[in-house]
């Protein structure tokens, strides 16, 4: 349940799909078990789409993508209680996210997860959308279900030839 008294960090998420309809996911440095789609905070005064494109470049190391859709409403999730004190100095109890569906227009060699000095991911792969939730960290599974529900028909209608 979402409490009006708690503060949620504004964030964007990116569901990047390739020409086969598979989704980009990365394995974070702080996890050996879970994979996630790129996401990150929105800077003060930054437009949501601008933030999504910046996060794509920072985390995936590419700008070879075009925005296809944006979800309609904020999606909220709470961090586990034990994680709150170590994330963002305990300021937020979770995140509120707006998600962007992006079509990858490049080749795999155009992806560089080591683009920044502090990469988010140690590995990456293309994941079938049907298996996406199973690879996610438990507290993000409901978010991923909502994102898939909103975007999967668009992805299926957008699979393109090489």
Swiss-Prot record:
Listed EC numbers: 3.6.1.-
Record keyword Isomerase present: no
Hydrolase listed as a keyword: yes
Keyword entries, A-Z: Hydrolase
SUPFAM superfamilies attached to this UniProt entry: Nudix (SSF55811)
GO molecular function: bis(5'-adenosyl)-pentaphosphatase activity; guanosine-3',5'-bis(diphosphate) 3'-diphosphatase activity
Any single GO BP term: nucleoside phosphate metabolic process
Motif segment (Nudix box): 40-61
Co-factor(s): a divalent metal cation
Ranges of residues in domain Nudix hydrolase: 7-149
Pfam families on file: NUDIX (PF00293)
Family of the protein in this entry: Belongs to the Nudix hydrolase family. RppH subfamily.
Family matches, as HAMAP family: Nudix_RppH
NCBIfam families: PRK00714.1-3, PRK00714.1-4, PRK00714.1-5
Task performed by this protein: Accelerates the degradation of transcripts by removing pyrophosphate from the 5'-end of triphosphorylated RNA, leading to a more labile monophosphorylated state that can stimulate subsequent ribonuclease cleavage.
Protein name: RNA pyrophosphohydrolase
Species the sequence originates in: Wolbachia pipientis subsp. Culex pipiens (strain wPip)
Gene: rppH
């Amino acid at each position: 349940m979402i409490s009006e008294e708690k503060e949620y960090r504004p964030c964007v998420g990116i569901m990047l799909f390739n020409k086969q309809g598979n989704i980009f996911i990365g394995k974070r440095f702080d996890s050996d078990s879970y994979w996630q789609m790129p996401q990150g905070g929105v800077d003060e005064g930054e437009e949501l789409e601008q933030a999504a494109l910046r996060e794509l470049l920072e985390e995936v190391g590419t700008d070879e993508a075009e925005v296809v859709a944006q979800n309609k409403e904020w999606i909220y999730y709470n961090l586990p209680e034990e994680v709150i004190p170590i994330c963002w100095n305990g300021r937020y109890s979770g995140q509120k996210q707006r998600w962007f569906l992006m079509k990858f227009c490049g080749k795999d060699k155009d992806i560089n997860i080591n683009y920044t000095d502090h990469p988010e991911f140690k590995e990456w792969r293309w994941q079938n959308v049907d298996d996406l939730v199973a690879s996610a960290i438990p507290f993000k599974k409901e978010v991923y279900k909502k994102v898939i529900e909103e975007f999967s028909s668009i992805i299926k209608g957008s699979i393109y030839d090489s």
